[in-house]
Amino acid sequence: MTQDEMKKAAGWAALKYVEVDSIVGVGTGSTVNHFIDALATMKHNIKGAVSSSVASTEKMKALGIDVFDLNEVSELSIYVDGADEINAHMDMIKGGGAALTREKIVAAVADKFICIVDNTKQVDVLGQFPLPVEVIPMARSYVARELVKLGGDPVYRQGVITDNGNVILDVYNLKILNPKALETQINAIVGVVTNGLFANRGADILLMGTPDGVKTSTN
């Protein structure tokens, strides 16, 4: 099984958690694109979706899935999204695609967070993948200095503007032993919109594509 085939298996496995007549929270990324393809097969049985990015919105609309603004929706039963890293406690690093803030907002609304990944994303300790931090542009240098104080090496992601008009700092060389505490600490830096640690709101269900099929874990 190739990596993409494992992603596809995980994406399609999430379809069984979609309820008839519901609005589905949909994330962003290569694994989520497989879920969107799967979701399109039952588009007539759901009300539609809420999207975490312009890219996912465009893909769903092209496939005929109705997309709602989150402000129109008071509840979501599930949010389906991928991760750049996930540990045994279902804490995650997300934001490689720069959609972390909207992803975190939609995840906060949903009753259940279903994380879909291939087995290369599972780690013992978070931090090998650089931690994305979304920053108000004028605060970039200040936030970078504060992140250095935390032991990280922040790098400005050149040429990337988020859907919210902000910039991304990717923080390297963090060994994240307490994800919840670090998520809170970084978010308290003035000028930070949010960071890519999803620990205070981690995943509830993990669907991991492996060479032996999709493995399911619950939190």
Curated annotation (Swiss-Prot):
Molecular function terms, GO-annotated: ribose-5-phosphate isomerase activity
Pfam families with a match to the protein in the record: Rib_5-P_isom_A
EC number, UniProt record: 5.3.1.6
GO cellular component: a single term: cytosol
Residues annotated as transmembrane: none
Keywords, comma-separated and alphabetical: Isomerase
Annotated GO biological process: D-ribose metabolic process; pentose-phosphate shunt, non-oxidative branch
Sequence positions that bind substrate: T28, G29, S30, T31, D81, G82, A83, D84, K94, G95, G96, G97, K121
Active site positions, chain numbering: E103 (proton acceptor)
Pathway the protein acts in: Carbohydrate degradation; pentose phosphate pathway; D-ribose 5-phosphate from D-ribulose 5-phosphate (non-oxidative stage): step 1/1
Catalytic reactions of this protein: aldehydo-D-ribose 5-phosphate = D-ribulose 5-phosphate
Family to which the UniProt record says this protein belongs: Belongs to the ribose 5-phosphate isomerase family.
Oligomeric and partner information: Homodimer.
PANTHER family per the UniProt record, alphabetical: RIBOSE-5-PHOSPHATE ISOMERASE
Function comment: Catalyzes the reversible conversion of ribose-5-phosphate to ribulose 5-phosphate.
Record's protein name: Ribose-5-phosphate isomerase A
Organism name: Shewanella denitrificans (strain OS217 / ATCC BAA-1090 / DSM 15013)
Top-level taxonomy: Bacteria, Pseudomonadati, Pseudomonadota, Gammaproteobacteria, Alteromonadales
UniProt gene name: rpiA
